[in-house]
Amino acid sequence: MKCVVVDMRNRLFGDAISGSLQHFDVGFRVYQTEGTAAEDLCVDTHADVLVAEVTAYPPWRLEQRLDLCRRLRQGLPGCRVALVVDEVCEPQLADQVRRAKKDGLIDGFFYSSVSSDYLSAMIDAL
C-alpha cells in the first residue's frame, strides 16, 4: 500500500484529492497536512509520495517547495514529490513548475484542472 502525504493550501481541494486517492482501486494510506509540517509527516509516515500545492504565497511558494523536495531527497530518498499548480490563475508559476520537472528538481506535477482519476493513476505510477 502506497503512503501519500497531501499538503494543500486549499483544504477543500486537499480533501477532494485525499478522498479520490482513498477510493482508488490500488489503495493508498493518505495523510493531510499544511505548510511546514509536511516534511515531518513524510518522515514519520515513511511517505512514498508528497503531493504539494504551489502558490504565490508562503509557505507554498515554489522556492519553498523545492527546498522541501531537496530535504526529502536527502532524508527520505524513496519519497517522490509531485507539485500541484493552478495553471489558469498562475500561468507563469505553472511554467516554472513545468521547468522544475524538466530540470529534475521534482518528480512530477499536475495542473489543478486534471481529473481526480488521472491524478490518482499518475500518483500510483510515481
Task: Tell where the protein language model's regions lie, with residue ranges.
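Two-component/phosphorelay signaling modules centered on CheY-like receiver
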Residues: 11-35
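Two-component signal transduction core modules
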Residues: 50, 81, 108-109
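Output/docking surface of receiver
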Residues: 86-125
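Extreme N-terminal starter segment of soluble prokaryotic enzymes
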Residues: 1-4
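Conserved phosphotransfer microenvironments
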Residues: 49-75, 85-88, 92-96
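Acidic, metal-coordinating helix/loop segments flanking the phosphotransfer/catalytic sites
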Residues: 32-49, 57-59
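Proline-centered flexible-loop/turn and helix-kink motifs
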Residues: 26, 74-77
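Conserved acidic carboxylate
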Residues: 7-8
